[in-house]
Amino acid sequence: MRKNRGFSFSSKAVMMCCLAFLLIPASFAFAAPNKPFPQHTTYTSGSIKPNHVTQSAMDSSVKAKWDSWKSAYLKTAGTGKYYVKYQSNGDTVSEAHGYGMLATVIMAGYDGNAQTYFDGLYQYYKAHPSANNSKLMAWKQNSSFQNIEGADSATDGDMDIAYSLLLADKQWGSSGSINYLQAGKDIINAIMQSDVNQSQWTLRLGDWATDNTFKNATRPSDFMLNHLKAFQAATGDARWANVIDKTYTIINSLYSGYSSSTGLLPDFVVLSGSTYKPASADFLEGANDGSYDYNSCRTPWRIATDYLMTGDSRALNQLNQMNSWISAKVSGNPSNVKDGYKLNGTVTGSGGSGAFYAPFGVSAMTSSVNQNWLNSVWTKTAGSSNEGYYEDSIKLFSMIVMSGNWWTY
């Protein structure tokens, strides 16, 4: 048997190795993040953050929440792909996929594998196109990664995936193996084509919602105003301004007409004549379709984020009323927040949920009058245990925003 020979590197050999390394194509290397976590973004003047804990402590809490989320829900999906485990049986949905792509791009810098995860999530998205528009994502897959329950899209997943790609362009640039910016623009244009009702300039429920029953319906949890502004900035498509303006109009119409005492928004909205109103029971998902339930619980986070990032005050009255109502309703204790309310404030839920209390922390950031309430929501959220994919995702994003670590395109 031959004996191994020892290696000794001459200076020439070292130079050759270094030259070979430099000749490796850029597509095989990952870029250093331009906006590593934590970012400590300056939000709109007059807005607040929790002031009973240090910035370092908030950053550490977000890191811990991310580590827990990643361990529980971010999973491999074959070679070179990742997905977000939505249910214990292994099913996933495009909503979850969008959350995964957003979280990985935001946590880059702290998490050294963030770009690997992001690119793997992108490849999974590419492998599951909607049957109606191939740039959008089929909304649900089973544990074998096969499309189930219809291969069409859901608007919220489409929007988060597109927005995450814009952030990825800012985070890592688009000169590597994936042109993040172009991919994002492609999805944005597909959203305009298939997820926007261009006769009303409203967001559809998905690319499937074109018949008379659903074509004029919309879902307030999709009212991601800052996403819409980023879409316009990235593409230069002025039509996005129509969608932004109409979305704010609907928020204020619902607030003035149906929830002036609470500021709450319903899960689903329909057009009746020329008026947008809460959907009736069992419109799409269940008895609480016209109430503040498991879709619209995200609206304090989604809508308030645009105010924090841009200062756009068109929904500020609605947000302020909601902040005042909920803090009084629960006597300043987020543990008393229930998982469901009618728009008049009557409780419909039976218990507590992080999906409901955490987003109220984001909306509380609009004014210093909410400081004690915001501090309480932060403490409750940061100290919470795992509940499930949906609750834990919303808690993570709410904490990212509350800690001052959200940023935009």
From Swiss-Prot:
GO terms for molecular function: licheninase activity. The keyword Transferase does not apply. Keywords: Glycosidase, Hydrolase, Signal. The active site is at residues 95, 156. One of its GO terms (biological process) is carbohydrate metabolic process. InterPro entries: 6-hairpin_glycosidase_sf, 6hp_glycosidase-like_sf, Glyco_hydro_8, Glyco_hydro_8_CS. Residues 1-31 form the signal peptide. It catalyses: Hydrolysis of (1->4)-beta-D-glucosidic linkages in beta-D-glucans containing (1->3)- and (1->4)-bonds. SUPFAM superfamilies: Six-hairpin glycosidases (SSF48208). Its EC number is 3.2.1.73. Belongs to the glycosyl hydrolase 8 (cellulase D) family. This is Beta-glucanase.
